[in-house]
Amino acid sequence: MTKTITVAHIQYDFKAVLEENDENDDEFYINVDKNLNEIKEHKIVVLGNSRGVDAGKGNTFEKVGSHLYKARLDGHDFLFNTIIRDGSKMLKRADYTAVDTAKLQMRRFILGTTEGDIKVLDSNFNLQREIDQAHVSEITKLKFFPSGEALISSSQDMQLKIWSVKDGSNPRTLIGHRATVTDIAIIDRGRNVLSASLDGTIRLWECGTGTTIHTFNRKENPHDGVNSIALFVGTDRQLHEISTSKKNNLEFGTYGKYVIAGHVSGVITVHNVFSKEQTIQLPSKFTCSCNSLTVDGNNANYIYAGYENGMLAQWDLRSPECPVGEFLINEGTPINNVYFAAGALFVSSGFDTSIKLDIISDPESERPAIEFETPTFLVSNDDEVSQFCYVSDDESNGEVLEVGKNNFCALYNLSNP
């Protein structure tokens, strides 16, 4: 049964309204999407002389954390998480399409743009290095290598490039794809990487030589474009099923690794990176493109996939016939990105919606389940989010960085109230 995640948007500067401390009443709005064609506006009145707020009959609005607010409107609960650091104030204007982070001696961020540029930033979003025209068209993905001293980029120009963070040099370009390269996964220390493309292939590369070791395709349709991939280590059951295969001498760390792919057709495939076999195929349940997918970091049997029609599906790879959970976000509006981190799922939908959904343990089945009844909305000025990036913190639940169009680059704290 499909469940609907009700979407709400709060006035971007509502915190300023709350903190004005005026003698007179003021107000801000929360818009709740009832359906595609109907939006209900709730006016939250901030009473003068610090007398609290009036959210209307039967409704409430309160602060529950340093950057977290809760509204109960017409029986529905909504959480709103506000920005703790606005990186756009430090950056030259651009549309951001890719992000990653690494921390060795110091925290760094990398951002990719629609113009093909790469920006390397320090922990305060100060520009350390800019690689202009790293690609001739939009950058689709950026990944730091585990050393933190090199990164790899992919682009609509059909190429992948390896870069030195220290001096911006490009020691290797990986050429072979015949359409946009959509995604990257790094295996272990980075001698091997995987790349996905709209040409229907997933390529396994050896970075030292730039050699393609193997090309994966969907067996039933080799030209079915790949929008998104995720790498994971097989479960005990999956590892038991690995067939013996002679490893190429250019492969490092591929044993036990699987890559899952979301296709333009909506089909999802799983490939054993070591044996080179396609092991699972999930059907195109919603007859539209699977735009993005991610693996549950706490249980690799479960994956989450976002589709062109606004559906979010949870799949159990042990039961591939149909999803174990179906959720509708902004019906008819594409899901741009799904990302698992810190026990939660982050979802970008359409031009203006960014949601955090906690993953909980279902009390009956004990499987991971999406807690959809109280979504957390990451507050922005109706900005379209391209990608998410988790920033770990030993002292809390960490932070998440969002990047997107119109110079959007914002950091949110994930600590619980």
Curated annotation (Swiss-Prot):
The keyword Ion transport does not apply. It is found in: Cytoplasm; Nucleus. The keyword Cytoplasm applies. One of its GO terms (cellular component) is nucleus. It holds the Pfam family WD40. It comes from the Eukaryota. Coiled coil: none annotated. Gene3D superfamilies: YVTN repeat-like/Quinoprotein amine dehydrogenase (2.130.10.10). Its main location: cytoplasm. One of its GO terms (biological process) is ubiquitin-dependent protein catabolic process. WD repeats lie at residues 134-173, 176-215, 242-281, 285-325, 330-371, 380-416. GO terms for molecular function: protein folding chaperone. InterPro entries: WD40/YVTN_repeat-like_dom_sf, WD40_repeat_dom_sf, WD40_rpt, WD_repeat_multifunction. Keywords: Chaperone, Cytoplasm, Nucleus, Proteasome, Repeat, WD repeat. Associates with the 19S proteasome regulatory particle (RP). Interacts directly with RPT5 and RPT6. Present with 2210 molecules/cell in log phase SD medium. Belongs to the WD repeat PAAF1/RPN14 family. Acts as a regulatory subunit of the 26 proteasome which is involved in the ATP-dependent degradation of ubiquitinated proteins. Is not a genuine component of the 26S proteasome, but an auxiliary factor that interacts with the proteasomal ATPase of 19S regulatory particle (RP). Acts as a chaperone which regulates the highly structured assembly of the 19S regulatory particle. Involved in the substrate specificity of the 26S proteasome and is especially involved in the degradation of ubiquitinated GCN4. May contribute to the stability of the 26S proteasome in some stress conditions. This is 26S proteasome regulatory subunit RPN14.
